[in-house]
């Protein structure tokens, strides 16, 4: 039995206290609050520092762990097709809701006050780019140059190619995959350390926001939080509910079945924390072990439905808050970019924030990366909605793909979801499929 963690030592509580202090300082001493801006800026720079290496490690390992493409390619193709279809739907739903509810309208933030030097740097290099230019820009001149300049799409291009190459290498590539996997763990260790500074960044950003723009801005930020939670709730029960029903099982009963994992995610704000438990339960539900072993870990990089919803809503919120008028074509272009950058989002606390920074950095200065300062104080409180939606989305995806592959014991699933205690699932032909190595923490 674990020792109970003191209430005040939880990051969630510390950020909440920091936000309250920032709001108080900004309201009572606006001039002093506005001077707290460097605290938020410093935290953003620390997060931006980690973007390229984290995307590189997570994407390479995620693709490489799919295993031998010749033998499990059918499952992989179906999984990737499902992931792209559902995450695209999540992005579009987020776009529709944020445009209908307009949570950022009325903030009237001057983007130049967020970080004038960086804004000038982005806008100076912004050019009207046609499709051919955009596609050519995705290809880096050099790999080192892509990392040095922080060109996220170029880093993604190299990462995908390397992941595919390691997959083709088979056993010879496992050492490299293992090293990169451990490297990604180390990177997230750094992120965990940086997230301890989140209260300081939240305090500085909130004090600056309230001091500069008034207490009324807090209402708009709270509205964004409500919009994200509402959209995730609707996505789970309407979209995933329809997918589950079409696939022959009850989403509600499935949620009851994985309630322990949902509560774990609620407490940690990380869907990764429930990965071992959800895999075990999916196997017990009747999904074949090889399908579970391939779909679940791949989904943790490629099927983050909650994160996709958040990314679209947050990006458009920043546009609304800074009075950047986006055309429909530009908003669809953001979705196109997010289809790429969201694949680098890790299912850990802070992953969505990192990916949002990566996305804004690819838009040629149209939206200021420094607009993230508006979200530091509330990002942590939206992570529960994202993480739980990610968890449920990956669980549903695994059951659906297992059924497509005829690797699902339908009768066993029915008994388990109805609360029966059937015997251990029998071995199936699918159990002979090569199972990709999966390391859990």
UniProtKB/Swiss-Prot annotation:
Intrachain S-S bonds: none
PROSITE patterns linked: NA_DICARBOXYL_SYMP_1 (PS00713), NA_DICARBOXYL_SYMP_2 (PS00714)
Gene3D superfamilies documented for this protein: Sodium:dicarboxylate symporter (1.10.3860.10)
Subcellular localization, as worded in the UniProt entry: Cell inner membrane
Region spans: Disordered: 416-441
Parts of the chain that traverse the membrane: 13-33, 43-63, 80-100, 146-166, 188-208, 223-243, 309-329, 334-354
SUPFAM superfamilies assigned: Proton glutamate symport protein
GO cellular component, one term: plasma membrane
UniProtKB keywords: Cell inner membrane, Cell membrane, Membrane, Symport, Transmembrane, Transmembrane helix, Transport
GO molecular function annotation: fumarate transmembrane transporter activity; malate:proton symporter activity; succinate transmembrane transporter activity
GO biological process, one term: L-aspartate transmembrane transport
Membrane topology: Multi-pass membrane protein
Role summary: Responsible for the transport of dicarboxylates such as succinate, fumarate, and malate from the periplasm across the membrane.
Similarity comment: family membership: Belongs to the dicarboxylate/amino acid:cation symporter (DAACS) (TC 2.A.23) family.
Protein name, UniProt field: C4-dicarboxylate transport protein
Species: Chromobacterium violaceum (strain ATCC 12472 / DSM 30191 / JCM 1249 / CCUG 213 / NBRC 12614 / NCIMB 9131 / NCTC 9757 / MK)
Taxonomic path: Bacteria, Pseudomonadati, Pseudomonadota, Betaproteobacteria, Neisseriales
Gene transcribed to yield this protein: dctA
């Amino acid at each position: 039995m674990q020792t109970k963690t003191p209430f005040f030592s939880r990051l969630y509580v510390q950020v909440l206290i920091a936000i309250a202090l920032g709001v108080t300082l900004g309201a009572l001493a606006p001039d002093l609050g506005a001077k707290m801006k460097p605290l938020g800026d410093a935290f953003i720079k620390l997060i931006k520092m980690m973007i390229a290496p984290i995307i590189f490690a997570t994407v390479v390992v995620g693709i490489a762990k799919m295993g031998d493409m010749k033998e499990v390619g059918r499952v992989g193709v179906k999984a990737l097709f499902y992931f792209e279809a559902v995450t695209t739907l999540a992005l579009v739903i987020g776009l529709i809701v944020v445009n209908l509810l307009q949570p950022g309208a009325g903030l009237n933030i001057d983007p130049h006050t967020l970080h004038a030097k960086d804004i000038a740097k982005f806008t100076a290099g912004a050019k009207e780019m046609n499709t051919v230019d955009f596609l050519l820009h995705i290809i880096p001149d050099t790999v080192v140059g892509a990392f040095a300049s922080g060109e996220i799409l170029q880093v993604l291009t190299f990462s995908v190619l390397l992941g595919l190459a390691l997959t083709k290498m088979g056993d010879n590539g496992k050492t490299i995959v293992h090293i990169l996997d451990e490297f990604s763990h180390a990177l997230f260790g750094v992120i965990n350390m940086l997230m301890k500074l989140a209260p300081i960044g939240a305090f500085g950003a909130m004090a600056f926001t309230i001091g500069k723009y008034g207490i009324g801005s807090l209402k708009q930020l709270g509205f964004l939080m409500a919009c994200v939670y509402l959209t995730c709730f609707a996505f789970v029960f309407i979209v995933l509910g329809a997918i589950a029903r079409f696939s022959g099982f009850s989403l509600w009963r499935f949620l009851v079945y994985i309630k322990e994992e949902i509560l774990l995610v609620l407490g940690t704000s990380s869907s990764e924390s429930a990965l071992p438990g959800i895999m075990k339960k999916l196997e017990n539900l009747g999904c074949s072990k090889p399908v579970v072993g391939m779909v679940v870990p791949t989904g943790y990089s490629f099927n983050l439905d909650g994160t996709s919803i958040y990314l679209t809503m947050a990006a458009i919120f920043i546009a609304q808050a800074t009075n950047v008028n986006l055309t429909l074509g530009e908003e669809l272009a953001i979705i196109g970019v997010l289809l790429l950058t969201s694949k680098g989002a890790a299912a850990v606390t802070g992953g969505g924030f990192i990916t949002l920074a990566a996305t804004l950095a690819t838009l040629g200065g149209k939206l200021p990366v420094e607009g993230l300062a508006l979200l530091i104080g509330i990002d942590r409180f939206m992570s529960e909605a994202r993480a739980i939606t990610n968890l449920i989305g990956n669980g549903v995806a695994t059951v659906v793909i297992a059924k497509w592959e005829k690797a699902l014991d339908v009768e066993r699933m029915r008994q388990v979801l109805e609360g029966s205690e059937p015997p251990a699932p029998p071995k199936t032909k699918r159990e002979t499929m090569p199972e990709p190595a999966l390391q859990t923490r």
